Regions:
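Conserved catalytic core of the tyrosine transesterase superfamily
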Residues: 1-325
Length: 325
């Protein structure tokens, strides 16, 4: 467990202070705590006694190790950046390193209104090629699941693994536990989405003959629906749209999240609302660990401005209501 980690270098009190501060803000900070233990060992191994970070005493830490992936290197540097900021805040002037290792940003497919209409038509019309009652039930889950992904901008993993204990439909809230970035958060549903989910849960309870454990049960109801199953279904249904063979970049399930975010920013622009004002709220809704992650979408919007040209349409006009079969 992260709370059993013992730091012993001259930076130990500051590392402990940083981890406590992060956890008090709601971050789990488990993986980062172990990386900081590695940094604590690095500090000891080099016999550093100082309590400030400099380019010189960080040189060895910032080097990419043999067979070390870019992602892990970024994580190692990232915790030191956080520590440097923490030290600076306490008056210990420290060097803040730059993350030189970069990922190539993937091209995203921001779905247009017409693409969304066709996609959700296929989702709502989907019927399995079998009369198996569990596959029939799952066909009823997909319209809700994909609406949750699109209307709430949630990640696919946290959506699939949503348990009923995390769902409060009286308050219209999902509690996302230990999401990406190791931070819990609340996701608020609109009144329409809340009503839709209530009807859906009533359906699940009736079909299963008991209160469901998972909001999106898999074929075996004691387990949640799998991410590969959702991706495969999305791909199969996208292929049935008229856009499948005409778009340059095939969309993924995750692009529903990108489309949600892009539409929110465009809507604010139409209403004259500053993106900077809304940035903290959007960042919290998406579960980002930093505003920099959310800022990424601002550039997507600039690139996709001409693609999503009907920005004033509400999602309810684009996505039809779910009809129970």
């Amino acid at each position: 467990m992260a709370n059993e980690i013992v730091y012993v270098s001259s930076l130990a009190p500051f590392i402990e202070g940083l981890t406590k501060e992060k956890r008090s803000c709601g971050f789990k900070y488990h993986r980062q705590a172990y990386l900081l233990k590695d940094f604590d060992d690095y500090w000891l191994d080099n016999d550093y006694k100082e309590t400030v970070l400099t380019p010189e005493n960080l040189e060895g830490w910032l080097q990419q190790k043999e067979n070390e992936g870019t992602g892990y290197l970024r994580n190692r540097i990232g915790v030191v950046i956080e520590l440097a900021k923490y030290l600076n805040g306490l008056g210990y002037k420290s060097y803040i390193p730059k993350v030189e290792a970069r990922y190539e940003v993937p091209i995203r497919h921001i779905l247009t209104n017409q693409e969304l209409k066709e996609l959700f038509y296929q989702i709502d019309s989907y019927k399995p090629d079998t009369s198996d009652k569990d596959f029939v039930r799952m066909a009823e889950e997909y319209p809700i699941l994909f609406r949750v992904l699109y209307h709430l901008g949630m990640r696919i993993q946290e959506t699939c693994s949503l348990s009923m204990s995390q769902v409060d439909l009286e308050k219209g809230v999902f509690t996302i536990l230990d999401g990406k970035g190791n931070k819990d958060r609340l996701v608020y549903l609109s009144d329409d989405m809340t009503s839709l989910c209530k009807v859906y849960v009533e359906y699940l309870t009736r079909i299963l003959g008991e209160s469901p454990k998972w909001f999106f049960p898999g074929k075996k109801s004691e387990t949640h629906i799998s991410v590969p199953a959702v991706r495969a279904t999305f791909n199969a249904l996208w292929k049935k749209t008229s856009f499948a063979n005409t778009c340059n970049k095939k969309p993924t399930v995750h692009d529903l999240r990108h489309t949600y975010t892009t539409e929110r920013i465009n809507k604010w622009a139409e209403q004259g609302i500053s993106f900077k004002e809304m940035l903290p709220y959007l960042s919290k809704q998406l579960g980002h660990k930093s505003y920099q992650e959310t800022n990424y979408y601002y550039h997507i919007v600039e690139d996709a401005y001409n693609v999503i040209h009907e920005k004033d349409k509400t999602s309810s006009e684009v996505i039809p209501e779910v009809k129970r079969r």
